[in-house]
């Protein structure tokens, strides 16, 4: 299929380009017909077929941020990688814009596997995925349904369906709280239809209140400063559509995590507010090819871009072990 997307060609990432890695823009379609934009990275001068890894996340970010950093670093270590913008976000297609879906966004990972599996420079039996933050949960769901995925890494994982339905730390895990949320979202849905547009929720709060939780301040330090700001990132700008949680509210993203047979490495900072997502998800996983790696002292956003904290040596070793 011919691409209908308009892609920037200049280097507009939040991280420096590695001269030891070749880079180009690519596109591919998912099963719903949505065209996805991605950055492809591979070791300069190396010959395939390569083991390959598809990378996405965090939730509300774009490929020019954390996922691209991970993808480029893995390419420097010998893998062919793609960092993609999920459907409805970034340079990828899909309308309306700025919505998330556990079904479609899980499919986005499988679409990346489609793309990788037919390339001459990729070994289709050696394909893995890596999901950051909210796309860690999507990655586990993809691993549960797509048997072509041989190894999955999650870093600083969120279960977006759980946090949407239950609130942070499950403090709103009751029918009345969920009903009130449904009322609010459906009232907004009516208002959006009447207005012919979609109200945006706003990205990371700016300026950040002095009494904000530490993790909100951490998000601000990444998404709203030169460290991680990007103009196409929802978290850096206008945020998701207000009604986007409707897709997540009644779903159970990790319902079949216990049926994942392929290898999984879950990585989380032990001081992250979100660490309970990985701890709880790991208890569902079965088999001796599953590992939970907790990084002492690390918070949620440390695993976004802190090269001194992200355990790339362990990630590389994991993929070498299971993508062989």
Regions found by a protein language model. Give the residues of each.
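The serine-hydrolase catalytic nucleophile loop
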Residues: 60-72, 86, 278
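Alpha/beta-hydrolase-fold enzymes
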Residues: 140-224
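Short beta-strand/loop motif that positions the catalytic acidic residue
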Residues: 260, 266-268
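Catalytic histidine-centered segment of alpha/beta-hydrolase-like enzymes
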Residues: 298-309
């Amino acid at each position: 299929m011919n691409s209908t997307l308009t892609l920037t060609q200049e280097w507009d990432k939040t991280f420096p380009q590695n001269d030891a890695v070749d880079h180009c823009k690519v596109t591919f379609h998912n099963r719903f017909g949505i065209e996805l934009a991605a950055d492809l990275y591979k070791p300069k001068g190396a010959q395939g077929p390569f083991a390959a890894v598809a990378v996405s996340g965090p939730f509300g970010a774009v490929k020019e941020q954390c996922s691209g950093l991970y993808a480029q670093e893995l390419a420097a270590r010998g893998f062919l990688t793609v960092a993609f913008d999920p459907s409805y976000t970034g340079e990828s297609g899909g309308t309306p814009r700025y919505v998330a879906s556990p079904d479609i966004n899980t499919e986005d990972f499988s679409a990346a596997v489609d793309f990788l599996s037919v390339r001459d420079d990729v070994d289709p039996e050696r394909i893995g995925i890596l999901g950051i933050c909210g796309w860690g949960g999507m990655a586990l769901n993809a691993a549960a349904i797509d048997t072509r995925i041989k190894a999955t890494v999650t870093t600083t994982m969120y279960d977006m369906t759980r946090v949407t339905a239950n609130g942070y730390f499950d403090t709103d895990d009751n029918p009345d709280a969920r009903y009130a949320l449904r009322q609010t979202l459906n009232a907004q849905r009516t208002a959006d239809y009447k207005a012919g547009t979609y109200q945006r929720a706003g990205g990371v709060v700016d300026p950040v209140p002095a009494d904000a939780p530490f993790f909100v301040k951490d998000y601000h330090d990444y998404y709203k400063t030169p460290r991680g700001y990007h103009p196409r990132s929802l978290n850096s700008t206008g945020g998701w559509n207000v009604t986007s949680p409707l897709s997540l509210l009644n779903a159970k993203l990790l319902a079949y995590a216990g049926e994942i047979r392929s290898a999984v490495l879950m990585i989380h900072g032990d001081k992250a507010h979100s660490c309970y997502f990985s701890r709880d998800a790991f208890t569902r996983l079965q088999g001796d090819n599953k590992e939970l790696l907790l990084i002492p002292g690390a918070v949620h956003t440390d695993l976004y871009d802190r090269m001194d904290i992200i355990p790339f040596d362990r990630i590389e070793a994991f993929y070498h072990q299971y993508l062989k």
